Amino acid sequence: KVPRQDAKFSLLDLISKSLESNSTELKDGDILCISSKFVALSEGRYVKLSDVDVSSYATEIAEKYNIDPHLSELIVQESDKIFYGFDGFVLTFKDGILVPNAGIDTSNIMPGYAILYPEDSFKSAKILKSEIKKLFGTDNGIIITDSRLMPTRIGTTGVAIASSGVKPIEDERGKTDLFGNSIRVTQKAIADDLSSAAQLLMGECDESVPIVIIRDSNLLVSDNDQSSQTFSVGFDECIFIKGLSNSKI
């Protein structure tokens, strides 16, 4: 649990103070799951909505889907692709993730502001891993997390938007199942699974728990660099998007 932050701050300093106030020390192999919005806030990635100039395209989206025009403009600027929308939301592709409103949030931020994703989540994770090792002398993994919706399911789960030092995917292809059948497509989303576990403690409201330490996971912590290509496929390869695009229903 950490104090509420209302402006840009040093994430490393806050982690250090939080460990001390919670009488906790990091150990080699610990994995830190950190809220993407908390990382973004530490980097100053928040915007006063009234300061955003609205384009005609953003106005069109705002009117069509009942979205604040200034928020709509941020969605246009931040999205890698916009698919479609419904009342209050548009479905977008951002940093390898299918996410509403380009991951932009107006909750857990000062009224009248919106908080974005970190500028470069993988770079942020890598730098933080290095800084923690210098400060504490421990080798830790970093996962930057967010909450997400799953098709046809009620409620949110966790998703990893970036990591450093944690192998995000375990490839099961080529192995055999209980009956000797060859596994053809299965790859375990390790970083996403850990993010979902952390999400149970982080919550979505006023819990003030943006950082969760995962210990004794038996996962190897390494210095391998990651990218969005390590985590995800392009939207043109996504089974949900392709399936719905080709649906004749």
What are these regions, as identified by a protein language model?
Residues 1-249:
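N-terminal and secondary-structure boundary signal
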